[in-house]
Regions:
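Perimembrane helix-loop-helix junctions
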Residues: 166-200, 265-272, 312, 318-330
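Membrane-interface transmembrane helices that cradle and orient dolichyl/undecaprenyl
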Residues: 128-148, 178-182, 257-277, 318
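Membrane-interface alpha helices of multi-pass inner-membrane proteins
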Residues: 145-161, 167-173, 201, 285-294
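Membrane-proximal, lumen/periplasm-facing interface regions of secretory-pathway glyco-
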Residues: 16-18, 330-387, 401-408, 425-426, ...
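Short periplasmic/luminal acceptor-recognition loop of GT-C membrane glycosyltransferases, typified by
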Residues: 149-151, 164-168, 358, 371-424, ...
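Transmembrane-helix motifs of polytopic, lipid-linked glycan transferases
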Residues: 70-94, 98, 105, 129
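Short hydrophobic alpha-helices at membrane interfaces in multi-pass membrane enzymes
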Residues: 136-154, 183-189, 193-197, 276-286
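Hydrophobic/aromatic-rich transmembrane helices and adjacent perimembrane loops
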Residues: 165, 289-290, 295-337
Length: 520
């Protein structure tokens, strides 16, 4: 019932427009369905696992935002079920129910952008499935399952790089289990080998497939070489400010639930069953905290990596508190108190989020969560592109809105689907600008989109964006394109198409300009 309730909320909001990360994964998944290695047309820091999951979802349910979010609904439900199984095996059925409910609630929250199908949802799904399978393998002494658990940990890494930390946790947990019993060095070594071989297998297959496509150099540069810059770009002071900006907001969306989880963190001090599981829960907590801290960006959806262990701690609090009351001979009314307090905390969180979860339509939800980001407008722009281009045409988006490529079913004239690397403070920025200019000029896209919205650029002040990229943009558009439409973003977005766009002299604070190639 818990899974069904939260699935119904997600289903109501399935048509929320894709945000830009979703747009990237959806476009890459679309390319995979066409038999194209996404790194050929998408320069991305992300590993290909989530794009492959998107391809599967799009192939099953259709190529639109609703399909993506129905896929997320199923992934979230499966994750909740595996968390129920883990917590039940660890702390009992009551803990399992509370854990599943907590995860379903917290992972839906707007403060972690839980309605968007971010890679972190897929990392968590494979990680918790792997954890459940690893515990099953060890409890039932089924060595072959350790290899299968390793494969799942490897897939968690392929969804997004921080997923590797869950594999590190698995190694530590396996070692802890081995050392807590009569030592069998050979058996432990075999178990390590099975786990690591399983984790390496999907990664090796991925590298072989990309190498065969001829795009391994591009893949390696973006996902490993250039990622080193990205992962060290935020100073510690700025990272702490980002944590203070996003962390408290997340907690205040479900304060009662987070307090219960905090109580669960202390449970090993006052409950024997929680004490027996302390290495499992608290080492997983440590790894999850490290996972959300990598790079010090602390973006809202990064916190999804923390939610499984927070949910386990909430389950531990309610279950262990009930167990302690039972052992002290409490009355039936007192025995149900921990569960009732948890239900009250859940209901209060739902009430605090009632506008987004129960009242707003999908477009309103997008505007409420993402503010001036042009995600609803991207859909309209893409429809115009699709109606006025042919299937084999290419387009270019000068802005960080890859969802336009996905919606329009048109391929990108350049691999730079985000402008951020081009305008960040990093050694490759000017070189990347020149590369993008060359790719666009060589492709001569049929339509070009210029996104004049700050969140689509976020330029560093000391990068040569005005001198190089924007100067070229103005000249290139003037020489080769004519205005086809404008999305004027104000209190309510106003769209102007065709000849009317040429006559429009009252641009809004934020605008998206659509240009078509001049006839030769």
């Amino acid at each position: 019932m818990v899974v069904v309730f939260f699935a119904l909320i997600r289903f109501r909001l399935r048509a929320v427009p894709l945000e830009r990360d979703e747009g990237e994964y959806a476009y890459a998944g679309q390319l995979l369905l066409q038999g194209i290695d996404p790194y050929h047309l998408v320069y991305s820091l992300k590993l290909p696992g989530t794009s492959a999951m998107y391809a599967a979802v799009l192939g099953l349910f259709g190529q639109n935002a609703s399909a993506v979010h129905v896929g997320l609904l199923l992934v979230n439900a499966v994750t909740s079920v595996f968390l129920f199984l883990i917590a039940t095996r660890l702390l009992g059925r009551l803990a399992g129910l509370v854990t599943a409910c907590t995860y379903a609630l917290l992972s839906l929250g707007a403060t972690v952008t839980g309605m968007a199908a971010h890679a972190t949802h897929f990392v968590v799904a494979f990680a918790v499935a792997a954890i459940w399978l690893l515990r099953k393998a060890l409890d039932e002494q089924r060595a072959a399952l350790i290899f299968s658990a390793g494969v799942l940990f490897g897939l968690a890494f392929l969804m997004k790089q921080p997923g590797i930390l869950f594999a590190v946790w698995a190694v530590a947990y396996l070692a802890r289990r081995g050392w807590s019993r009569p030592m069998n060095w050979r058996g432990l070594a075999y178990d390590f080998g099975r786990l690591l071989a399983g984790a390496a297998l999907p990664c090796a297959i991925c590298c072989v497939l990309i190498a065969r496509s001829g795009d391994f150099h591009t893949f390696w540069f973006w996902t490993f070489s250039f990622l080193r810059h990205y992962g060290t770009a935020v100073p510690l002071r700025d990272g702490m400010l980002l944590l203070l900006l996003h962390g408290p907001v997340m907690v205040l969306s479900a304060p009662g639930v987070w307090l219960i989880a905090l109580l669960g963190a202390t449970a090993p001090a006052w409950n024997p069953r929680a004490k027996a599981a302390v290495f499992f829960t608290h080492s997983l907590l440590l790894v999850s905290l490290i996972a959300i801290s990598l790079g010090l960006y602390f973006r809202p959806h990064y916190f999804i990596l923390l939610l499984p262990v927070v949910s386990l701690l909430a389950g531990a609090a309610v279950s262990c508190a009930t167990e302690e009351l039972l052992q002290r001979g409490a009355t039936r009314a007192l025995l149900v108190l921990p569960g009732c307090l948890f239900l009250l905390a859940v209901c209060s969180s739902l009430y605090l989020q009632r506008g987004v979860l129960f009242r707003m339509n999908p477009a309103q939800v997008s505007r409420t969560i993402y503010q001036e980001n042009p995600f609803p407008e991207a859909l309209e722009i893409a429809h115009r592109i699709r109606d006025h281009t042919s299937e084999g045409d290419t387009i270019a988006v000068l802005g960080s809105e890859p969802e336009i490529y996905f919606y329009s079913h048109r391929r990108s004239a350049t691999g730079f689907i985000y402008m951020y690397p081009l305008v960040e403070r990093q050694s490759y920025s000017v070189e990347m600008q020149k590369q993008m200019i060359h790719e666009i000029e060589s492709s001569r896209p049929s339509m070009l989109v210029l996104v004049e919205v700050p969140s689509s650029w976020v330029a560093s002040p000391d990068v040569a964006r005005p001198d190089t990229l924007m100067a070229w943009t103005r000249n290139y558009i003037s020489d080769h394109y004519i205005l086809e439409g404008i999305a004027e973003m104000s209190a309510r977005t106003h769209y102007v198409w065709g000849d009317n766009a040429l006559l429009d002299q009252t641009p809004a604070p934020f605008n998206i300009f659509l240009y078509r190639k001049k006839e030769q």
